[in-house]
């Protein structure tokens, strides 16, 4: 296990950690459907990326009809 040579003060420790925070990415608007999506990702609403359909989305299945 590593052992420190000298004590690291709270100020020096916190200054080192100042740049460790995570920043949320700004969502972009889908050019096909207008929904918000993550940058450089396929739109979850319509399955398009770069104005091309990449994923064909299936229709939702109604479970209420099957349960009866």
Curated annotation (Swiss-Prot):
Record keywords: Ribonucleoprotein, Ribosomal protein
GO biological process: translation
Domain of life: Bacteria
Entry GO MF terms: structural constituent of ribosome
GO terms under cellular component: large ribosomal subunit
InterPro entries: Ribosomal_bL32, Ribosomal_bL32_bact, Ribosomal_zn-bd
Residue ranges of the region described as Disordered: 1-21
Family: Belongs to the bacterial ribosomal protein bL32 family.
Name of this chain's protein: Large ribosomal subunit protein bL32
Species classification: Bacteria, Pseudomonadati, Pseudomonadota, Alphaproteobacteria, Rhodobacterales
């Amino acid at each position: 296990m590593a052992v420190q040579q000298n004590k690291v003060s709270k100020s020096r420790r916190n200054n080192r950690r100042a740049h460790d925070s995570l920043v949320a990415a700004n969502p972009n608007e889908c050019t096909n459907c207008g929904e918000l999506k993550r940058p450089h990702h396929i739109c979850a609403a319509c399955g398009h990326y770069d104005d091309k359909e990449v994923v064909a989305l299936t229709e939702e299945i109604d479970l209420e009809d099957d349960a009866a």
